[in-house]
A protein has these predicted regions:
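N-terminal accessory beta-strand-rich subdomains and adjacent acidic, glycine-rich linkers
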Residues: 1-158
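Phosphate/adenylate-binding glycine loop and adjacent helical scaffold
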Residues: 167
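Aromatic-lined carbohydrate-binding/catalytic grooves of carbohydrate-active enzymes
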Residues: 172-220
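Conserved catalytic cores of very large enzyme subunits
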Residues: 162
Length: 220
């Protein structure tokens, strides 16, 4: 926690994991900072991370074995701050933390805004704030990790006063059908007519939700 007041610039965080190259890890490996977090978790070794192509890293949770124990590195209560990643630079002796720098200039690429220039720091934030939790969950086998609620317990309380109206249910999903349909009198695509059509379709078929996927903020 920081109580300095005003605005604060965080240059970097340091975290070095005490792993040997032969230690087993389970990692969600992605290529670069920008990712949709949809990769398959990979069973490899700490040394295997060193052989990945430049820019590759692992997002949380990062799981490794040490002295017969299963250990999951996780984070919680993460707001206005870059998420923790793990990478293994070729000139390093063990895996360590990696954080996305703050974008300095953004450019439009397709339906995304991507940084073309970055700052030399990872966060510009309030000087009075709590920082994200970094935690190690230790277990004797994998199923204990799956049943652990450390991330939930470390998180801030819900900002929603009454969440009883939030319930699971089916949804019409525009991206899954590639913004497409048949028998309509307008051009299919990510446009207002298509969104209205999906809303009407959901209502007519008692589907409680509609999902507006990637590109909604700038158009497809």
């Amino acid at each position: 926690m920081s109580k300095n007041g005003g605005e604060m610039i965080v240059k970097q965080e340091t975290l070095k994991l005490p792993l040997k190259d032969a230690d087993k890890v389970i990692a969600h490996i992605v290529n670069g900072i920008r990712t949709s977090f949809e990769s398959i978790f990979t069973r490899t070794t700490a040394g295997g991370l060193k052989g990945l192509k430049k820019g590759a890293n692992a997002s949380m949770p990062f799981i490794f074995e040490k002295e017969g124990m299963k250990i999951a590195l996780v984070e919680s209560d993460w707001t206005e701050y870059p998420g923790l990643r793990i990478h293994y630079p070729k000139d390093a002796d063990s895996p360590r933390a990696l954080f996305a720098p703050v974008p300095k200039k953004l450019v439009q690429k397709g339906n995304q805004l991507q940084p073309s220039e970055v700052e030399d720091y990872i966060a510009k934030t309030s000087g009075t704030r709590e920082f994200p939790w970094r935690a190690f969950i230790v277990a004797r086998d994998d199923k204990v990790l799956a049943d652990n609620d450390t991330v939930y317990k470390l998180a801030s309380e819900s900002k929603i006063g009454d969440a009883s109206w939030i319930t699971p249910g089916s949804s019409v999903w525009d991206w899954w059908v590639n913004w497409n349909t048949k028998g309509v009198d307008f051009k299919c695509g990510f446009n207002e007519q298509m969104c209205k059509y999906y809303v009407d379709f959901a209502a007519d078929n008692d589907i409680p939700y509609i999902t507006l996927d990637a590109g909604w903020h700038v158009g497809r």
